[in-house]
Amino acid sequence: MDNMKDHPLYRKHDIDSAMNALWAFYKGRFVALFLISLVISGILQYATMLIDFKSLYTVTDPALVLEKLKSYMVPMLIFMVAGLLSNTIMHYYILHKPIDSSMNIFISIVKSLKYFIPYLILMVLFACFAVLAIVLGVFVLFIGAIFAALYVGMLSFFILPVMMAEEANIQQTISRTIKLAHSGFWANMGWSSIFFVLYLIISIVLSGVVLLPFAGSFMKTFANPQDTSSIMHLPNDPLFLFLSSAINALTLPLSPIFGFIIYFNGKAKEESSSISFTGNDNGEQKVRVEDLYAKPREENNFDQPPAQG
């Protein structure tokens, strides 16, 4: 992308500016991001209803349970692929909308498709690496497993930003992801850890809000543990479906935004360290200011009205 530096998230960050940029970008474009995420979450939430997990609770034979789980493999794979596709679309929209006024969600859906197959292949490879890293981490006790999980999570933030912003192929994406993630490694690990903790807290609180209208059903179950019918049918309740989709829509854009923040931070630091010299009329060498910092733009003011999506 030639105009990558025009993106409002492109700059060198510290932890304070990174979190402020995350909140400002999210707040400034909340309506568009929420509506897009609501549609995506609604589709994914409805897809989970098609997988009849509650029938597992009526089966006591382990062999039958395994047979049931095998029958769920294809629907679960379709669900995972749909989740990766929605993630690809969201990343493309967040990258291009702030610097291209003609961009909308429908264009994003079409143009993001060219990244989906390479991303799908990368995620299969990445999943194998993640399992290996976490298993190896287990041998270094519980702390090792946590560190490995955080490391894998940190790497995942760079994959789509690198692929989309640099038009990289699979091999280039792997190479650039490793390079940018390990440039400022401890800062990236620290920021990712803070993000994961905040994301977890927000998700738990919002999930509690979703369950408030159904507190009566839980109270009945606590009073009579043998009667779980009200809880079992909860995922099929239209109100629960809508509230769950709305809550997921609130948190869905956070990960892509944060991914672009740490990517652009690494990219800006990388470019500022690669100082280019140009000759003047007297043959002398001078450093250009624009080689050190991204050009300041009015668009970097996050308090402006959100772009229409």
Spell out what each predicted region is:
Residues L44-M80, A130-L150, S203-L252:
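Membrane-helix interface segments in multi-pass membrane proteins
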Residues L33-L35, M73-L77, L120-V124, M189-G190, ...:
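Hydrophobic alpha-helical transmembrane segments
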